[in-house]
């Protein structure tokens, strides 16, 4: 699954991921994304062993600890702000790219770690959505 870890990755990296591959074992998964500007971002989901939330951002000036669980205060503040203003804290484009990143990750796992472009995953997602809509309309 990994939505929270992927959201943290996107908070650091921003949009612009082009391709993804995912390596898996019985202990967990490592997903690697390549961004348009050449940066590489990784997400690791651990299924056996310590459940640690957070990460490390590597910059030209050094490394910085990121993420970590600080409670729900910040999330609730953003939810309240959204209900007051009607303006979502994250753009539609970023939200779609995050879900496309996860779709590409799953496709890569199904294909033994093959590199999947986000465009390929996006098109597959649209195709799958149209099938679901068609099936729902038949009921």
Q: Where would I find each of the regions flagged by the language model?
A:
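Aromatic-acidic/polar surface patches that form glycan- and anion
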Residues: 1-2, 68, 72, 88-94
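C-terminal substrate-binding/catalytic lobe of Rossmann-fold NAD(P)-dependent oxidoreductases
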Residues: 29-77
């Amino acid at each position: 699954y990994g939505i929270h870890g992927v959201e943290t990755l996107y908070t650091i990296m921003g949009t612009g991921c082009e391709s993804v591959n995912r390596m898996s074992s019985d202990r967990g998964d490592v997903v690697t994304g390549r961004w348009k500007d050449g940066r590489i971002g990784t997400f690791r989901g651990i299924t056996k062993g310590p459940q640690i939330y957070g990460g490390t951002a590597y910059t030209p000036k050094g490394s910085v600890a990121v993420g970590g669980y600080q409670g729900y205060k910040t999330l609730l503040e953003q939810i309240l702000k959204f209900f007051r203003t009607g303006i979502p804290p994250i753009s539609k484009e970023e939200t779609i790219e995050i879900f496309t990143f996860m779709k590409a990750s799953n496709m890569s796992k199904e294909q033994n770690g093959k590199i999947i472009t986000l465009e390929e995953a996006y098109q597959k997602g649209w195709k799958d959505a149209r099938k679901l809509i068609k099936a729902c309309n038949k009921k």
